[in-house]
């Protein structure tokens, strides 16, 4: 748990989950241009930029994120936007959501540099 009060997981916990093959959605809330610089390639990855989410709200969420009880791990560049989106989802009834602390930048620095950094 972070000072913002939203549930969090570390980049190490994310790596363990990615390697375990478990069932969850990795929701990347970065803007489209950011994906050109760094991305975790995984079939569980779904992308919805924060700007699109702010505009369209719940209608913008991918189908895989509609299950309010399914596990959703939210990632962004450094963890700020993912914490905001995690809070937003929790206030709208999602129950199993966590922000990835440090974001994709932390993942690239601590786990896998091949995902890229910017």
What are the language-model segments listed below?
Residues 1-25, 32-71, 80-118:
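Rhodanese-like catalytic fold shared by cysteine-dependent sulfurtransferases
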Residues 75:
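Short, surface-exposed ligand- or partner-binding patches at beta-edge/loop junctions that are enriched
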